[in-house]
């Protein structure tokens, strides 16, 4: 009986082994060194008998996935680029097809969280040996995100970058958009209204206002209907990551079926600098201006034209409807060569 079970297990592993890989590369992301790593990855995979193709076309990827004659059981996609590229690939794949991030963006927040490598040999090892695992995603007005969605001053900076971007972004590229936003942005009040449906678990829906010394689980108690949040800085996290290594919401968990909302009430430069200093020191969660909630669905609105961004990409103006998509994305556990 034991031998039979072992044979069945080996058959299942063989049946799930990756035999075809498409590398989806963003034409705007990455440097020359990164492009060389893509070429090396193609050589490595083909040398190991894995069919491999590089594409810049999401349409071509969609056609391949829709080809029932080819099947997708032993198919995987490498997303070579930044967080926006990974989210774009994920949005156009069914949940069961595994994705391997190959970080080539500016921040690479998802790749840093899961420790994915940009080195071709490591990516090849992940494709050969990585176990499948799932994570949640979010949806903002129909656009999928994996890390976070924000509205307010930081989204205005991202919008400024969107208007002037010419190729690969580096950190110093944000200097001009930051100065532009500081001179123009008026910090309108943003309102977040939670959509509490019947499927919200009373043990996990609740107000986490002000942080404090009470444990997170103890704070999430039997509060089914929360009032709106009014604030100048509005953020919702799927991962506990933000640009420049800022730990704004350290408790966000990517597999709990919830988004972690963090709002900071006051606008204008001095309040923003105060919040930034507290975030750097890890003190901001104790500030009375800070409101935290864990939600499944919400809508953000504003009386003025307030931008919002998802995973570092400008996405439009408020209003925005946001929801969590539990277990929406499959990744392969990173391995090293």
Question: Where does each model-flagged region fall?
Answer:
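ATP/NTP phosphate-donor binding region
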Residues: 1-77, 87, 199
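ATP/nucleoside-binding phosphotransfer catalytic cores, i.e., glycine-rich phosphate-binding loops
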Residues: 10, 253, 263-337
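Catalytic core of DAGKc-family lipid kinases
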Residues: 46-48, 55-56, 63, 95-100, ...
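N-terminal glycine-rich "phosphate-gripper" loop used for MgATP/nucleotide binding
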Residues: 79-83
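Short Gly/Thr/Asp-enriched flexible loops that form oxyanion-binding sites at enzyme active sites
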Residues: 85-95
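Glycine-rich phosphate/pyrophosphate-binding beta-alpha loops
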Residues: 150, 154, 235-248, 314
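Gly/Ser/Thr-rich active-site loops/lids in small-molecule metabolic enzymes
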Residues: 165-172, 242, 250-270
């Amino acid at each position: 009986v034991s031998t039979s079970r072992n044979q069945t297990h080996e058959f299942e592993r063989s049946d799930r082994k990756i035999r075809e890989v498409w590398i989806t590369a963003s034409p705007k992301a990455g440097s020359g060194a990164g492009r060389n790593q893509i070429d090396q990855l193609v050589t490595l995979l083909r040398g190991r008998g894995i069919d491999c193709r590089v594409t810049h076309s999401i349409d071509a990827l969609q056609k391949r996935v829709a080809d029932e004659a080819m099947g997708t059981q032993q198919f995987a996609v490498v997303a070579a680029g930044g967080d926006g590229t990974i989210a774009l690939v994920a949005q156009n794949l069914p949940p069961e097809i595994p994705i391997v991030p190959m970080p080539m963006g500016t921040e690479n927040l998802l790749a840093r969280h899961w420790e994915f490598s940009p080195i071709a040999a490591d990516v090849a090892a992940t494709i050969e040996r990585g176990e499948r695992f799932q994570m949640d995603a979010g949806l903002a007005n129909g656009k999928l995100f994996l890390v976070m969605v924000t509205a307010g001053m930081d989204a205005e900076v991202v919008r400024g970058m969107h208007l002037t971007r010419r190729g690969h972004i580096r950190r110093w590229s944000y200097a001009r958009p930051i100065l532009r936003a500081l001179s123009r942005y008026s910090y309108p009040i943003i309102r977040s209204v939670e959509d509490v449906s019947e499927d919200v678990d009373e043990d996990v829906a609740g107000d986490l206002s002000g942080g404090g010394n009470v444990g997170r689980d103890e704070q999430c108690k039997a509060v089914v209907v929360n009032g709106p949040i009014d604030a100048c800085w509005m953020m919702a996290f799927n991962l506990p990551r933000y640009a420049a290594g800022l730990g704004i919401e350290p408790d966000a968990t990517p597999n709990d079926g919830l988004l972690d909302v963090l709002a900071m009430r006051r606008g204008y430069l001095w309040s923003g600098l105060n919040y930034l200093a507290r975030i750097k020191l890890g003190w901001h969660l104790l500030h009375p201006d800070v409101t935290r909630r864990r939600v499944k669905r919400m809508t953000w609105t504003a009386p003025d034209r307030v931008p919002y961004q998802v995973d570092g990409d400008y996405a439009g103006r408020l209003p925005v409807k946001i929801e969590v998509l539990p277990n929406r994305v499959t990744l392969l556990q990173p391995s090293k060569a």
